[in-house]
Amino acid sequence: MAEEQEFTQLCKLPAQPSHPHCVNNTYRSAQHSQALLRGLLALRDSGILFDVVLVVEGRHIEAHRILLAASCDYFRGMFAGGLKEMEQEEVLIHGVSYNAMCQILHFIYTSELELSLSNVQETLVAACQLQIPEIIHFCCDFLMSWVDEENILDVYRLAELFDLSRLTEQLDTYILKNFVAFSRTDKYRQLPLEKVYSLLSSNRLEVSCETEVYEGALLYHYSLEQVQADQISLHEPPKLLETVRFPLMEAEVLQRLHDKLDPSPLRDTVASALMYHRNESLQPSLQSPQTELRSDFQCVVGFGGIHSTPSTVLSDQAKYLNPLLGEWKHFTASLAPRMSNQGIAVLNNFVYLIGGDNNVQGFRAESRCWRYDPRHNRWFQIQSLQQEHADLSVCVVGRYIYAVAGRDYHNDLNAVERYDPATNSWAYVAPLKREVYAHAGATLEGKMYITCGRRGEDYLKETHCYDPGSNTWHTLADGPVRRAWHGMATLLNKLYVIGGSNNDAGYRRDVHQVACYSCTSGQWSSVCPLPAGHGEPGIAVLDNRIYVLGGRSHNRGSRTGYVHIYDVEKDCWEEGPQLDNSISGLAACVLTLPRSLLLEPPRGTPDRSQADPDFASEVMSVSDWEEFDNSSED
């Protein structure tokens, strides 16, 4: 008894924890579930504690009732749902083969399933009967690993028989990815017309050009030889031609098709597509499902900028973050502008670059504007601004694009211009009450907000809101810190102000503080600060994450290729794939790009100093810090 009392005293713990961090802990074993399965398998192998016999095709299989009930809804309903099988020692199983039942029981006891071409169908039938989703998924994945042009129709029939929507989607994806080759097979013409119509209507259809869709629609009704020899009748066009997006075809191809067609509904459709090409300035206002890109790849894209190499170069290249590779790639298009710090807007998946800087030999503000069409990878120069705007902000509100304030390197501006894509024209709207440049803008709930910037040599922390309905500006609460040459983004009904610099310390320093504005409360707050300086950054929002691209750091005294991504749910920054060079003044956005661009092999960047005689005049041999003199950020 004395020993017992002594032990109790030695082990006595306080009734209440005195340490503030002392709390109850829960421990979880990562090995417990597998150990439990091994124990149950050992019981099965030893023939211990069996309490039910399954009778399948006249053969007996012993099992543990509680494990079966825990494994799937079918057995749970049988053994725990008040049915007569609860009391039976032997239970008859219908609609399942003996071999498949053995396979499924092995999976229940081990979590392992061995599939082959000889057993997959009967295993799938049994899994559907017994309602075991995991085994159904395994069988579907196994079938997909063996799908080819010869057996795909059989697998489609299997998916339809058991209502396997996931398998049907996988088969659809197989055809969408291999459409050009599959459309030249006999099996293609054996698919139901409704199925082919659905596939040809999909944005996920992988083709290099819309002409391949046109040919695929014809190949459902004609042989390849007939299509190639033009031995087809289009007076009453096949229904599948309704899925062809004729405006996405090249104008030359459309013209040849139009010239050989007799008067018919199809000829009228082709004529409308030709008119779309001829009215290039009005294309953004002529958008319809017929002009939608066949792609679901939304990418962060950056245009222009000025980058640091052995010399300082204004870029006319675009770069995009390839979602398949997780790295930055370049693409080029003819007549691309070569500038930096341009205002950027996206409307109907067209990119607009507005004004900006052409600071090659001194400071020069721009009034010229461009539009990029990813459907045809072409640039088009639209109507110029009515005056030059550098260090401006650009926003889309409704169907209009607004260019707000800035400077022309002689005067600071308060002018606001509005662009109407339907008329390709600019018009002045209500100006700001005072001049501002190097500010940033964003749109939220049909209104336009601009923040901070500079006026003369002074850094600002002002916030202004434009209401297009009343054509008026309103002043809101000041932000928490002065800054200029920063970026703004709208995310989850809040405005974020990111990056930039100020001289509050008596000299130019990066601003790491990130400010968040709530339109509901009208108040500013601070969130997780930037891990590095980003002045003149590119800003884009994709999948509820803010991308901050490149820029320049006054703390480091250089441009940067860093990419930082803000996760609003976790309130933290993470590093993204770094840009391939240090660049500032990048105009960034999110754009749907064609699959052909993302899937084509990477190409090297040509040496334009050899290919372009004008290129040499745009190169300056100065140090990395000295070339900041020609940056927008003075």
Swiss-Prot record:
Pfam families: BACK (PF07707), BTB (PF00651), Kelch_1 (PF01344), Kelch_KLHDC2_KLHL20_DRC7 (PF24681). Its main location: cytoplasm. GO terms for molecular function: 14-3-3 protein binding; ubiquitin-like ligase-substrate adaptor activity. Keywords: Acetylation, Cell cycle, Cell division, Cytoplasm, Cytoskeleton, Disease variant, Kelch repeat, Lysosome, Mitosis, Nucleus, Phosphoprotein, Repeat, Ubl conjugation pathway. GO terms for cellular component: centrosome; Cul3-RING ubiquitin ligase complex; cytoplasm; cytosol; intercellular bridge; intracellular membrane-bounded organelle; lysosome; microtubule cytoskeleton. Pathway: Protein modification; protein ubiquitination. The keyword Phosphoprotein applies. It comes from the Eukaryota. Kelch repeats lie at residues 299-349, 350-399, 400-446, 448-493, 494-544, 545-593. Residues 624-634 have a biased composition (Acidic residues). The modification Phosphotyrosine is found at residue 466. Residues 50-117 form the BTB domain. Potential oncogene that is up-regulated in breast cancer cells and promotes tumor growth. Substrate-specific adapter of a BCR (BTB-CUL3-RBX1) E3 ubiquitin ligase complex required for chromosome alignment and localization of PLK1 at kinetochores. The BCR(KLHL22) ubiquitin ligase complex mediates monoubiquitination of PLK1, leading to PLK1 dissociation from phosphoreceptor proteins and subsequent removal from kinetochores, allowing silencing of the spindle assembly checkpoint (SAC) and chromosome segregation. Monoubiquitination of PLK1 does not lead to PLK1 degradation. This is Kelch-like protein 22. It comes from Homo sapiens (Human).
